[in-house]
Amino acid sequence: MAQFYGNEQIQHTLHQMLLRDRAPHGFLFYGETGLGKKTLAKQFLAELLCTGTEKPCGSCKSCKMLADGVHPDVRFVEHSGKRNGFSVDTVREVCVDLASPPNEGNAKCYVFGDCDAMDTRTQNLLLKAVEEPPAYGYFIFTATSPASLLPTVRSRIVSLAVSPVTEQECCAALAERGFSPE
């Protein structure tokens, strides 16, 4: 699975939420395109779903399925329709799926990437699920701006601003992979 670099405070906050069993059931990761918001979502989900002692371990069944993109309790909801948004039918499927318990672990997770084009009707359909998810239900939205989501949706999730990687963080990431940072 791809490594997420930078934004140490966000990574620490997410880790602490999970350690203390205080993770909210909804997040919005927002920031410029190309910052790794979906990678951050995968990293969070790996830690949430991991069954190993050191989370994420990368070697348990859950970590391997997530890395391979076949975890039955994780759905990366795809855009559909003419306007590159999310279809009403897709959101209804998510709501129906959410009603059944997880297949493999203790959580079911839905990642809605690039929500800038998510229309009002679709967001309103999701509102009840986001507002009152079952104990095992988690939602992660990514967007370039928090204004992409309705205030009613935003008020029920935790919004975290993802920043560009600093030069120092970039050099450290290159060095970690065996490249000269110069």
Located regions from the model:
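Helix-turn-helix-type domain boundary/helix-start signal
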Residues: 3-4, 84, 116, 160, ...
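Small/polar loops that bind or transfer phosphate-bearing groups
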Residues: 6, 114, 141-142, 162
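A short alpha->loop->secondary-structure connector
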Residues: 93, 129-136, 159
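Catalytic acidic motif of RecA-like/P-loop NTPases
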Residues: 99, 113-119, 124-131, 147
